Amino acid sequence: MPGIIDSSSKQSAIVGNSYGSTELSHNVPIPHAEGDNVVVRTRAVSVNPVDAKMMGPYVTAGAIAGCDFAGEIEAIGPEALSWGFKIGDRVCASIMGMNPLEPDHGAFAQHVATHANALVRIPETMSFEEAAALCTCFMTCGLALFQSLGLPGSPVKPSASATQVLVYGGATATGTAAIQLLRLAGFTPIATCSPHSNELVKTFGAEATFDYNDPECAAKIRAFTKNGLRYALDCITNRSSMQICYGSLGRVGGRYTALDPYPEDIAATRKIVKAAWVVGPIMLGHDIGWPAPHGRKADPDLFKFGMEWKKLVEGLMAKGVIKPHPLDVRKGGMERVIECMEAIRAKEVNGKKLVVSLRENH
């Protein structure tokens, strides 16, 4: 087993407790690099809305939370050697934190265990903090845009037609990732956002922006798209967002994909629109043990898509053609992760991706 870790020692990590929430523990075992697992010394993590939603029945006591991390490989399991990684390699990944089926796999730890196939190599020109902010957003967007919505093109094989695609929530981290991918794939992204975020969203590549608080938002999108919009990605997913997306889609209908379960009664208002929602961790190739409606069996086809898409994202990172959302980097250790989750729950985060730097905390 290349790399030696004293797994009898303990580490700091954010774990589930018996009260249905998370807490900082300094008594978490350091994981072994067994089977196809790799252990990474964490240098930065990012905090996503999904992390803040891990409450109540989604919490497994003792399981490590967190999806996005970046760091350096410090141990490699024997079945992971075929992936070509070496000790000291700079890597990042999006994994399934708070996982009842693999409770020792989670990003919010000083030493992260993950299956080798989830890892993405970080280019030398990119910082750990930037890399930690990329994977969940860009992996989920790939699934939503090029698998669920079925867009006819990709960043490496652009569409011949600059078809318009609506990104609802364009100023979110997922929204700016989607806009970049759409541009690279030859599409024309348009987006909803608050007026104060217009310049940010256009900087990432949106052709036009629309104020979601405007009662005429959907009508203005229909006018701009000449009643021909066929694709909508909903990065917010609530009643208002779905109503605007459905009202924006053209007269012949189209496809709508959300990042969370959507209101079925709104979906029923337009039968000519095909609605779907995605769960990013399904691309990792394992069962998802979260409660319904998120829990599900592994899907070999989506795993295959995920591995192909991960390789594509790694290539885009190496070329320097994608960038993270504007970062709010916080220092001070794992306790800052708890603060970030609380800030997301309190809706205090706007236009920034929360990243915790752990470089000085080992």
Swiss-Prot record:
Q: In which pathway does it act?
A: Secondary metabolite biosynthesis
Gene inactivation effect: Impairs the production of phomasetin.
- The residues listed in the UniProt record as binding substrate, with positions renumbered to this chain, are T136, C137, F138, M139, T140, C141, G142, L143, G280, P281, I282, M283, L284
Q: EC annotation?
A: 1.-.-.-
Where along this sequence does the record place binding of NADP(+)?
50-53, 171-174, 194-197, 212, 259-260, 349-350
One molecular function GO term is: nucleotide binding
Q: What Gene3D superfamilies does the annotation carry? A: Medium-chain alcohol dehydrogenases, catalytic domain, NAD(P)-binding Rossmann-like Domain
- What is the role of the protein in this entry? Trans-enoyl reductase; part of the gene cluster that mediates the biosynthesis of the trans-fused decalin-containing tetramic acid phomasetin, the stereochemical opposite of the HIV-1 integrase inhibitor equisetin. The PKS module of phm1 together with the enoylreductase phm4 catalyze the formation of the polyketide unit which is then conjugated to L-serine by the condensation domain of the phm1 NRPS module. Activity of the Dieckmann cyclase domain (RED) of phm1 results in release of the Dieckmann product intermediate.
- What is the protein's given name? Trans-enoyl reductase phm4
- Organism this protein belongs to: Pyrenochaetopsis sp
